[in-house]
């Protein structure tokens, strides 16, 4: 009887040690990439609505205006036409606008893009992993990424055309 109780306690102790060890390993040894102002922007790979691969690191040498948005978001809806209007001018100057939708259906996003005739790359953050990495709250939230791939500013909330143009000027190479 005492042997069974001792064996049971040893097994419980081993399970607890294993759980603590696993927790420590997860916390200290697995490094999850997070966005930090002044640091290199966390890379991501998505497929845009036209089936083209977008990988952030491919835009080194260009400024990137990274916008997180949703079709249901009224402030997002208001600023999209301004981004669309400014896109050709700043694309010529070496600035890319990338809009990442907050994990909605393809049909909802495609309808929105068609309705506003958006010309810049639009993709869906399936599963919301990129939003988590960038710590996005609320929508819209945008990030200015310079030609060296560093995040230089986070912008929360709706922007006017004039504000957007100032931000695009900041990241023009």
UniProtKB/Swiss-Prot annotation:
It is a single-pass type II membrane protein. This is Thiol-disulfide oxidoreductase ResA. GO terms for molecular function: antioxidant activity; disulfide oxidoreductase activity. Pfam families: AhpC-TSA. GO terms for biological process: cytochrome complex assembly. The keyword rRNA processing does not apply. Thiol-disulfide oxidoreductase which is required in disulfide reduction during c-type cytochrome synthesis. May accept reducing equivalents from CcdA, leading to breakage of disulfide bonds in apocytochrome c; following this reduction heme can be covalently attached. The keyword Ubl conjugation does not apply. Disulfide bonds join 73-76. It is found in: Cell membrane. Belongs to the thioredoxin family. ResA subfamily. Keywords: Cell membrane, Cytochrome c-type biogenesis, Disulfide bond, Membrane, Oxidoreductase, Redox-active center, Signal-anchor, Transmembrane, Transmembrane helix. Residues 35-173 form the Thioredoxin domain. The chain crosses the membrane at residues 10-29. Pathway: Protein modification; cytochrome c assembly. PROSITE patterns: THIOREDOXIN_2 (PS51352). GO terms for cellular component: plasma membrane. It comes from Bacillus thuringiensis subsp. konkukian (strain 97-27).
